[in-house]
Amino acid sequence: MAMNFTSSEIDFVKDNEAYRPIPESDKRRLESAEAFDAELEKVRGAAAAGAMPDMRHCIIKGIDLAGRDLTGLDFRRSTFDGCNLHGTDFSGSQMDNVAFYNNDLTDMKLCGCTARGCSFRFQDMTGIDLSGANIYSSVLEDALNQDKVIIDDETKWYKMRCPEEGEAFIAWKCCTDLRVVMMLVPKDAHRCMATMETGRVSKVKVLKITSIDEKENYTWAQSTVDPDFYYEVGKWIEPANGFQMDRWKDSSPGIHFFLDRQQCIDYQSK
């Protein structure tokens, strides 16, 4: 089962601007409705024809924006802290790497948004409309009611890419010395994926171990995380530290995998 990435998603992984510090001079601190409205009016007036008004790098704190129309704006790398965003409509906005802290997000609309790398940790997600949204690499760990969001067939990266249950599939991982492990995930294995191309399972059978160019075959491979954990051809393997059932806890116990061979190689060799 191959993964289908857009070029923008690949670029987002390779060069995520969230890892670069924002200069203090670029930050805009908005802590009242009046300050927010004044800034919004200014950027709307300054936006070139066809361009999104620039609300990037804003620190928006303690403002009641419930039910507001904030569609078609560029909020990349902004922070909403302690705001009332109940029913706020961000549809069509650029929301990459937005951080949400201590807000009311219930019934918020992110329809058609590019919302990669957002943090929803500890937020109540009840009624958030993600129809048509791309939430690649967004953090839903420790959020509340992640299953009560609204999605549709155009929502990207909310649903798991692997079979959810009752179906076997092939998975891949890259071990020490770039040994590539081909694994069978049986139909009775627990499996989960969050909002990226990686996942975790509770059990695998090692089918084949090769070099990245597939010219060499090996009988074993060593884990890159636990030097005492080995994958051996023909053997059933279970994680030494158990399996975390919460799909949103991405970096947690389980056998981690990719669905695409080249993706696991790129991840390990980047």
Predicted ranges, named:
Residues 53, 180-181, 255-256:
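A broad, low-specificity signal marking well-ordered, structured residues that form hydrophobic/aromatic
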Residues 68, 194-196, 268-269:
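Short, glycine/acidic-enriched capping/hinge loops at junctions between secondary-structure elements
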Residues 163-252:
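Non-catalytic interaction/regulatory modules that flank or connect domains
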Residues 2-178, 191:
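Tandem repeat scaffolds
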Residues 247-268:
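Extended catalytic/binding region for NAD+/ADP-ribose chemistry, centered on the ART fold
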